[in-house]
């Protein structure tokens, strides 16, 4: 009998992957976690049935959520990552010798434990001496932070369930306060393609625009996320991701990536017309 993983993208659209075996499943205090093995995408895990990470395409997401802001401001030293229990975002950040401190906040310790056990590809740098892991709600963690971080990356789940609070106006206001005077906020921005995802994306984007003077949106193709068309939000107090971008300086670092490059850095901010119309002037 064949085993398939299926995610409901809309009432009329489903995405399926043929599964070779089930590796682990459990219900934590916060959510259900499943680890599966597939011939096409390798090992992957889901939270409450929603795709989080696959071994085959994780590099796309993690390259884009990290290297775009890091290349925009080469002087980033203190970073806060909210979510990111799989460790992929941390892995990419630790490639920069200039980064001095990385605080990672994950609400569900079991996500980290499971990824340490089953996903060494992404979790391999969680024990880096610069990394501090806090198991608590990111919304609460950031409330008492002020003028502390150069970069905040919100590598959260979707805007419901445990990650719901990370899409609120209060949260984005606290992120602004926690950033230094030239700080950058980057968050996964959902997909613009299906109506429900697009509505969540637009709502989150509108909230961020209330606080930051520089607002942009960029994109990547991630095959296992809904529609494959995925957006990231870039919000900054000072640095513009294209006008202040020094491609030559980043290339001199010699960081080898599988997806990100300096040509793509500029190109990923060129949005399709339907996305630009959806944002309706909500970028600088």
Swiss-Prot record:
One of its GO terms (cellular component) is cytosol. It is an enzyme of class 2 (transferase). GO terms for biological process: spermidine biosynthetic process. Spermidine binds at residues 62, 86, 155-158. The active site is at residue 155. S-methyl-5'-thioadenosine binds at residues 31, 106, 137-138, 162. Residues 2-237 form the PABS domain. InterPro entries: PABS, SAM-dependent_MTases_sf, Spermi_synthase, Spermidine_synt_N, Spermidine_synt_N_sf. Pathway: Amine and polyamine biosynthesis; spermidine biosynthesis; spermidine from putrescine: step 1/1. SUPFAM superfamilies: S-adenosyl-L-methionine-dependent methyltransferases. GO terms for molecular function: spermidine synthase activity. It is found in: Cytoplasm. Keywords: Cytoplasm, Polyamine biosynthesis, Spermidine biosynthesis, Transferase. Its EC number is 2.5.1.16. Homodimer or homotetramer. Catalyzes the irreversible transfer of a propylamine group from the amino donor S-adenosylmethioninamine (decarboxy-AdoMet) to putrescine (1,4-diaminobutane) to yield spermidine. Belongs to the spermidine/spermine synthase family. PANTHER family: SPERMIDINE SYNTHASE, SPERMIDINE/SPERMINE SYNTHASE. This is Polyamine aminopropyltransferase. It comes from Clostridium beijerinckii (strain ATCC 51743 / NCIMB 8052). The lineage of its organism: Bacteria, Bacillati, Bacillota, Clostridia, Eubacteriales.
């Amino acid at each position: 009998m064949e085993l398939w993983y299926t995610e409901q993208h809309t009432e009329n659209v489903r995405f399926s992957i043929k599964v070779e075996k089930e590796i682990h499943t459990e219900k934590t205090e916060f959510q259900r976690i499943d680890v599966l093995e597939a011939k096409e995408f390798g090992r992957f895990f889901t939270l409450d049935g929603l795709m989080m990470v696959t071994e085959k395409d994780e590099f796309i997401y993690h390259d884009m959520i990290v290297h775009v802001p890091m290349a925009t401001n080469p002087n980033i030293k203190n970073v806060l990552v909210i979510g990111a229990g799989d460790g992929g975002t941390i892995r990419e950040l630790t490639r920069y010798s200039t980064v001095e401190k990385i605080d990672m906040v994950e609400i569900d310790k079991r996500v980290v434990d499971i990824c340490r056990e089953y996903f060494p590809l992404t979790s391999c740098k969680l024990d880096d001496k610069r990394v501090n892991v806090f198991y608590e709600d990111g919304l609460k963690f950031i409330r008492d932070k002020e003028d502390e971080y150069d970069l905040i990356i919100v590598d959260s789940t979707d805007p419901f369930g445990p990650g719901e609070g990370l899409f609120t106006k209060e949260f984005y206001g606290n992120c602004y306060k926690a950033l230094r005077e030239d700080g950058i906020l980057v968050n996964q921005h959902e997909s613009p393609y299906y109506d429900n995802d697009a509505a969540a994306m637009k709502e989150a984007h509108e909230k961020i625009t209330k606080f930051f003077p520089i607002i942009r949106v960029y994109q990547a193709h991630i095959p296992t996320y809904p529609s494959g068309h995925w957006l990231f939000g870039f919000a900054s107090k000072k640095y513009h991701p294209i006008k202040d971008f020094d491609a030559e300086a980043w290339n001199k670092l010699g960081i080898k990536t599988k997806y990100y490059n300096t040509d793509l850095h500029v190109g990923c901010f060129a949005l399709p017309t339907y996305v630009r119309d959806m944002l309706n002037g909500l970028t600088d």
